[in-house]
């Protein structure tokens, strides 16, 4: 919003220099992006009167003599097609500076002496977008009734002596998209009440309201007012109005269109004017467009309307895209004599989408989409009628058609003085606070510490106590708030025990050679419940971007499998990844978060070289990695058990649930073939991994670790090769071995698993290494042999297992 400093003076007695005022406004929360002074850099530009004008033979040039208030007229050669005797024009004298810092000097053109230059508006710094069309390709000519005389500076006459404050307005402060709103804002800052009066209008024509039937959908246009003016004389606007329009970045067109734009700039209420002949049908309708309907807009662009566009029709065909731009078939022309004015409020969302859809954002649409003052609708239409009576000799017919007239009651926001002070860290008294609200134009009811603030409709951004805190803070002045140190309790700093353990576990798995992955917390409903023994109620996202990111994850393994797929697609198949993060559920109607740790392996356990043959990752390798992790954090491997369990997304026979002291803490195993085969990149690759719940495990850990001295006596190792049924698991075998081995068994490892040739159908071979140790005495073969006999007998009796 380009705000004129001179126009602000109509409402306020400003004694501050414009740049200083802009700085003060910026400090209160409405940023002033720039301050421009149009005459800056220009000099020796005066009003001149063309005394005579003759064509130069054989050229497009004109030889003129121009009165510039000096003793003798100046001879100036001009090439503009619209120069003529008797015109009041802009003259750049010898030594003048015009736009682009160009210096004007006397010289010869086609051998003819020229002592200056007759200028167009663009040549003295005006943008092409604001120059009236009749002067777009020529010099500017002052209106005949302009209060100017030869020799005077042009700056004041053209509004170039003004200062233009560029309000960089955020969507919540659209109340300042009108001069009255800006005056309220600046008035509150400088502690003045702006002089803003009501419009007193006397109607002098017959009642017209029965001549037009207006059918308006209240949802599309909650307020829709119409007025009619007759006997309108179309002509250029007075120069004072044109100055204000082009300083605000709007091109003057004619007195009717200019009045609607001027009133919009003044009140913030967009308006539109129709040639009354448009509604000879006697009907006006506001509705959504029908598919296939078309409309040629005022910019001569034909658009195919969308069923979501609000349009104004004459009962049959569209004549305006509501809130955006009028139609060419209803425009004001030089032949127009009767005008219908519209002042309305349209649905902001639909207007915004229409403007974007048709790439046609206008001053009106930008205001509608941010919001307009519901109390300005009638004032705006009456003011426009009054101005047209003065500038177009119009007759104002009696009556306003209020097709819709939804009322909006002013908001009352309740809070306390102490709350505002607590938030600001201030000690502002109730009296001073009420004075601040009075400066803003808010009425306050006070009851001790409690206040109820009545907010006028022009400030629709104020609705909650926090808004009042902001208003008090910015008007009081953020610079005036005392600086205080934050009151914080002294702590020793550092991490909690849980955080320390999580960081330690992360360091351990990194030491095992795993690389950290960080995946999305959002996933699909299908993936959310995979890799979990007992899936919980999922946490749904209210407005998901797509179905693949519509719920919160219940496992980390999904992200690691996705990461593996990404790497496999790039020929990186030797993977060892881990992730430590949170998973989420909605069990019991409450939202829960849990810390998990997951790891995923593929390919070989280590790179093949001349010393070592390759070895593929398998269940037992991953289990060994997890056992090492448990041992490193102080969990006795003897307390950890693995039981076969069906888990969605995992292999049915190569997966186990993990228990510590009979409490479920996670799962381990191979990703199901169905999952990897469904992925084009993985193509059925064997992926093994584990996922454990740290929230369950960490409380089980004991503080510190007990040092165990190195054994003084030798250990004895024995290997045991068994032929077992295919359905029997390693855990079952280990349980029997441990229960029969006696107290000297200190380690039990799987050293081989085999099934294939030389093994009976339905059977498989397990080979174990058993370590026996007596820490207090030398262990004898007799004791170990006795233990082995008991183990073999137990295996035969309990599981029908034979020794190979």
Curated annotation (Swiss-Prot):
GO terms for biological process: phenylalanyl-tRNA aminoacylation. Residues 408-483 form the B5 domain. Gene3D superfamilies: 3.30.56.10, Bira Bifunctional Protein, Domain 2, Ferrodoxin-fold anticodon-binding domain, Nucleic acid-binding proteins, Phenylalanyl-trna Synthetase, Chain B, domain 3. Mg(2+) binds at residues 461, 467, 470-471. SMART domains: B3_4, B5, FDX-ACB. GO terms for molecular function: ATP binding; catalytic activity, acting on a protein; magnesium ion binding; phenylalanine-tRNA ligase activity; transferase activity; tRNA binding. Coiled coil: none annotated. It catalyses: tRNA(Phe) + L-phenylalanine + ATP = L-phenylalanyl-tRNA(Phe) + AMP + diphosphate + H(+). Residues 711-804 form the FDX-ACB domain. Its EC number is 6.1.1.20. Keywords: Aminoacyl-tRNA synthetase, ATP-binding, Cytoplasm, Ligase, Magnesium, Metal-binding, Nucleotide-binding, Protein biosynthesis, RNA-binding, tRNA-binding. InterPro entries: aa-tRNA-synth_II/BPL/LPL (IPR045864), B3/B4_tRNA-bd (IPR005146), DNA-bd_dom_put_sf (IPR009061), Fdx_antiC-bd (IPR005121), Fdx_antiC-bd_sf (IPR036690), NA-bd_OB-fold (IPR012340), Phe-tRNA-ligase_IIc_bsu (IPR045060), Phe-tRNA-ligase_IIc_bsu_bact (IPR004532). Binds 2 magnesium ions per tetramer. GO terms for cellular component: phenylalanine-tRNA ligase complex. PANTHER family: PHENYLALANINE--TRNA LIGASE BETA SUBUNIT, PHENYLALANYL-TRNA SYNTHETASE BETA CHAIN AND LEUCINE-RICH REPEAT-CONTAINING PROTEIN 47. Belongs to the phenylalanyl-tRNA synthetase beta subunit family. Type 1 subfamily. This is Phenylalanine--tRNA ligase beta subunit.
């Amino acid at each position: 919003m380009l705000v004129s400093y001179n126009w602000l003076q109509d409402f306020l007695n400003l004694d501050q220099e414009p740049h200083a005022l802009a700085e003060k406004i910026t400090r209160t929360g409405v940023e002033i992006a720039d301050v421009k002074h149009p005459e800056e850099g220009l000099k020796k530009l005066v009003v001149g009167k063309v005394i005579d004008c003759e064509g130069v033979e054989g050229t497009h040039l004109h030889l003129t003599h121009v009165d510039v208030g000096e003793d003798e007229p100046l001879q100036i050669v001009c090439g503009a097609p619209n120069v003529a005797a008797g015109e009041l024009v802009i003259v750049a004298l010898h030594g003048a500076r015009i736009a682009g810092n160009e210096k004007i000097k006397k010289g010869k053109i086609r051998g003819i002496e020229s002592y200056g230059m007759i200028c167009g508006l663009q040549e003295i710094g005006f943008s092409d977008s604001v120059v009236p069309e009749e002067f777009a390709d020529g010099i500017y000519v002052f209106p005949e009734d302009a209060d100017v005389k030869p020799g005077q500076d042009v700056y004041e006459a053209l509004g170039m002596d003004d200062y233009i404050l560029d309000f960089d307005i955020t969507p919540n402060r659209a109340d300042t998209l009108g001069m009255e709103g800006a005056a309220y804002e600046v008035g509150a800052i400088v502690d003045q009440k702006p002089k803003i009066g009501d419009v007193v209008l006397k109607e002098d024509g017959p009642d017209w309201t029965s001549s037009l039937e207006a059918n308006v959908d209240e949802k599309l246009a909650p307020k829709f007012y119409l007025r009619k003016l007759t006997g309108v004389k179309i002509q250029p606007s007075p120069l004072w109005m044109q100055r204000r329009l082009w300083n605000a970045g709007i091109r003057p067109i004619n007195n009717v269109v200019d009045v609607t734009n001027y009133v919009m700039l003044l009140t913030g209420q967009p308006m539109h004017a129709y040639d009354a002949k448009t509604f000879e049908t006697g009907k006006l309708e506001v509705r959504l467009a029908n598919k296939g309907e078309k409309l040629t807009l005022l910019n001569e662009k034909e658009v195919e309307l969308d069923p979501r566009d609000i349009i104004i029709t004459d009962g049959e065909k569209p004549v305006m895209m509501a809130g955006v731009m009028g139609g060419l078939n209803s425009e004001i022309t030089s032949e127009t004599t009767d005008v219908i004015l519209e002042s309305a409020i349209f649905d902001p969302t639909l207007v915004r989408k229409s403007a974007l859809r048709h790439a046609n954002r206008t001053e009106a649409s930008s205001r509608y989409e941010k919001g307009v003052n519901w109390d300005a609708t009638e004032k705006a239409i009456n003011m426009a009628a009054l101005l047209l009576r003065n500038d177009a000799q119009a007759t104002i017919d009696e009556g306003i058609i209020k097709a819709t007239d939804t009322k909006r009651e002013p908001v009352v926001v309740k809070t306390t003085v102490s709350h505002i002070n607590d938030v600001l860290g201030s000690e502002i008294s109730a009296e001073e606070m009420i004075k601040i609200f009075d400066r803003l134009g808010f009425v306050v009811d006070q009851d001790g510490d409690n206040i109820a603030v009545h907010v006028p409709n022009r400030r629709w951004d104020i609705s909650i106590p926090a808004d009042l805190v902001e208003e008090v803070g910015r008007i009081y002045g953020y610079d005036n708030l005392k600086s205080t140190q934050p009151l914080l309790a002294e702590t020793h700093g550092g991490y909690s025990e849980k955080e320390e353990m999580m960081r330690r576990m992360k360091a351990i798995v990194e030491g095992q050679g795993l690389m950290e992955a960080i995946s999305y917390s959002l996933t699909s409903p299908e993936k959310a419940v995979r890799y979990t023994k007992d899936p919980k109620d999922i946490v749904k996202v209210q407005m998901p971007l797509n179905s693949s990111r519509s719920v919160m994850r219940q496992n980390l393994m999904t992200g690691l499998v996705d990461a593996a797929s990404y790497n496999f697609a790039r020929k990186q198949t030797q993977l060892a990844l881990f992730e430590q993060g949170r998973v989420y559920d909605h069990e019991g109607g409450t939202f829960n978060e849990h810390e998990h740790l997951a790891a995923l392996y593929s390919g070989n356990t280590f790179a093949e070289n001349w010393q070592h043959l390759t070895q593929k990752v398998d269940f037992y390798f991953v289990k060994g990695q997890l056992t090492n992790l448990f041992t490193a954090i102080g969990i006795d491997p003897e307390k950890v058990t693995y039981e076969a369990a069906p888990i969605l997304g995992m292999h049915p026979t190569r997966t186990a649930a993990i228990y510590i002291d009979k409490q479920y803490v996670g799962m381990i195993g191979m990703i199901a073939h169905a999952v990897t085969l469904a992925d084009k990149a993985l193509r059925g690759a064997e992926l093994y991994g584990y996922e454990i719940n740290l929230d369950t495990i960490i409380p089980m850990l004991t503080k510190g670790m007990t040092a165990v001295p190195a054994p003084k006596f030798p250990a004895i190792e024995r290997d045991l090769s068994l032929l077992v049924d295919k359905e029997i698991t390693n855990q079952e075998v280990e349980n029997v071995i441990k229960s029969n081995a006696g107290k000297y068994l200190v380690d039990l490892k799987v050293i081989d698993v085999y099934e294939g040739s030389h093994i009976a159908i339905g059977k498989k071979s397990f080979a174990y290494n058993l370590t026996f140790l007596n820490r207090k005495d030398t262990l004898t073969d007799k004791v170990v042999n006795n233990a082995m006999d008991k183990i073999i007998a137990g295996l035969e009796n309990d599981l029908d297992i034979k020794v190979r």
